[in-house]
Amino acid sequence: MSSSVVGASSNKKSGIRQSCEIIERERHSNDDTYSMTSTFFKLKENEIMSAQFDSLKYKILLISTAFVCGFGISLDYTLRSTYTGYATNSYSEHSLLSTVQVINAVVSVGSQVVYSRLSDHFGRLRLFLVATIFYIMGTIIQSQATRLTMYAAGSVFYNCGYVGTNLLLTLILSDFSSLKWRMFYQYASYWPYIIIPWISGNIITAANPQKNWSWNIAMWAFIYPLSALPIIFLILYMKYKSSKTAEWRSLKEQARKERTGGLFENLVFLFWKLDIVGILLITVSLGCILVPLTLANETSQKWHNSKIIATLVSGGCLFFIFLYWEAKFAKSPLLPFKLLSDRGIWAPLGVTFFNFFTFFISCDYLYPVLLVSMKESSTSAARIVNLPDFVAATASPFYSLLVAKTRKLKLSVIGGCAAWMVCMGLFYKYRGGSGSHEGVIAASVIMGLSGLLCSNSVIVILQAMTTHSRMAVITGIQYTFSKLGAAIGASVSGAIWTQTMPNQLYKNLGNDTLAEIAYASPYTFISDYPWGSPERDAVVESYRYVQRIIMTVGLACTVPFFAFTMFMRDPELIDKATHEEFTEDGLVVLPDEENIFSQIKALFRHNRSNKKLGC
């Protein structure tokens, strides 16, 4: 395999000049885009640095440092997802767990585009460092929060850092790999999940988050930066090596000669390039629409509150203003309509949206459901929640090698969607009670396989559909759609939970005070009422009822999910970083013969011809 990996990028040096010529043409055809920025030169820097990774030694170092960085990010995310539940429980506002998740996802929608576009302008490493600073700030604020509003504020900073580090790590690995091996490289930061599910439960049990959740979060303000240092130093070293080449010196000389515009001109350019107005409109709009859905519930009659109604109406109006702005005024729209008009782009984005929507609607409350209504211990519940990641991470090296052999991904995504349907059916059947343990484990395993076949495959398909100059932008849009799906999925599950759970608890428990405790602080409730007690049985029945509604919605959403997979294109994964030939406006032009419907028709024609020949 090692010789294949080296050979996968052996064409890079010879392809640098060709890639630079293509970018040069784009530069001169888009003078308004490049005249006052370093975007063109940063892309060429990436090309030169990429050639430095031809050695097997440096490829192993890149994958290893990505693994270490991914280990820090993934372990923190896994633990913090659980600690957030204990934090909201300590504020006696556990039902607002989805509110925090929605706030995280809404913030991510805007920040993804900013990171992707600025990384082309200032470089991947600088933005990675900025994201790390946000990560540390958010971690410190969350750990010291004494109320939900303060914790949510910390979540904004933390999530800006989290999505930034993930996106920039993906872009760094994409810059230095060919399409053929792109899946293998991108999964390197995901491999820690082979270990994490088996240690996270023990860590949570030993850390005792019921009492110590604050310190458990705070320690990651220095643990994660330490895990990121190896890849930071590696990139700095490769940049130093690149600076010794003649191409680099020539590039820097050209950059100095063509540097134009002062501070004000560059700020104005960035204002339009980042589409600041569009980012603010979509972020505020989604926040106004989605967050109230997780706050309003029948018990407090907040739906009759004028503030809730006004917020929802304002969000709807702002969304239409956003669409009008993007269509009429935005010089560099968040959603480039010309690019999105091709099914090779909009179909994978639709798959991304429903993939994350289905995941978050089914898993947002999975941990408390396991603890409260399935008699799982905290260790067992943590392992089950993380089991899909373990399955995907364990199978990813073998899947990546298969992809490198076949060089196609569309059928894998279709298979992943079919697996999602089976998974949601199992979650519907095994949604609570003592006999649900094996069924939930089976559903989690299938969920892991579906995630393996769908999530990163869609990213690689989109990157294969665009040129290098568009790769960061389209990857940022893909991440935006993933967070949009996550935000809406978490909002829908939160709305169902807050609208349905209180009444079910009041109905089954017959005690208003006890119902309020079970709703606001379920972890405290289960410590007082053991498994098999009448009160616990009543709560289990309530959880089963609510989970039935949530899983029904999730199962229904797999239908449009499947429809989008059928319309995707299936570009070949070549031995280059991107397709640079057969392109038009930064999009790879593919024939329509690879449409799945055309393939099915061709299959039937082949069968009929065989029958006529007597085969």
Swiss-Prot record:
GO terms for biological process: glutathione transmembrane transport; intracellular iron ion homeostasis; transmembrane transport. The keyword Ion transport applies. Keywords: Antiport, Cell membrane, Ion transport, Membrane, Transmembrane, Transmembrane helix, Transport, Vacuole. Its main location: membrane. Residues 80-120, 174-186, 238-275, 328-343, 405-407, 462-547 are extracellular. The keyword Transmembrane applies. One of its GO terms (molecular function) is siderophore-iron transmembrane transporter activity. Pfam families: MFS_1. The chain crosses the membrane at residues 59-79, 121-141, 153-173, 187-207, 217-237, 276-296, 307-327, 344-364, 384-404, 408-428, 441-461, 548-568. This is Glutathione exchanger 1. The lineage of its organism: Eukaryota, Fungi, Dikarya, Ascomycota, Saccharomycotina.
